[in-house]
Amino acid sequence: PIPLLEGDQLRHGYLASISFADSLVGQVLEKVSALGLDDNTVVVIWSDHGYKLGDHGGWAKHSTVELDIHIPLMIRFPNMKVPGARTSALVESVDIYPTLIELASIDPPHVLEGASLLPLIEEPQRPWKEAVFAQYPRYVKRQLLMGETVRTQHYRYTAWVGNDTGETVAQELYDHTNDKIEAKNVAKNSEYRVELDRHEQLRKLGWRHIREKLDEMISQDSI
């Protein structure tokens, strides 16, 4: 464990770095405006990962918990229909590229894991992805396991899968309605059996299944 004083110093440094980065972003946006480029500039601000500051007994990233995977994402472009709007929809970093190429009127490649966020940006409360995915490895007793995690609107489910065997050796399920900090694993609680099975099925179906459902929904909305 990190001593209390050292932990406070680390948190202080982390918050200071955020403030510094925020000021730099402000300088960039001010320069864009001063150059008269607001009307043809797309701004995207996001992080590649979250960060633990002593939470879950750890520091930095390197896990599948919400703090490490849930990141900020802000997008600004000219003539937005709903500027400053927020959404609680589930989105992924792989959605950024499809969004940018649509804004640039570039035809997308045949297969993309992500989906353009423009329909969601224009209508922030609309239905969107049922689930999003991430993964991170760890060694347990010299065995390499891949943590395959699925986030839905109210739950996070993680299956720890043997890299060599493909077998699931452990499961985690967190109920975000009652446990936003993911402190209690309810995977073995019989009351959550239906949700456990549903999320395991989503994991096996994977991102292609979610993309197909989203594409179908968007197509129906455009009719």
Language model features with spans:
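Beta-strand elements within well-structured catalytic alpha/beta cores of enzymes
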Residues: 14, 18-21, 25, 42-47, ...
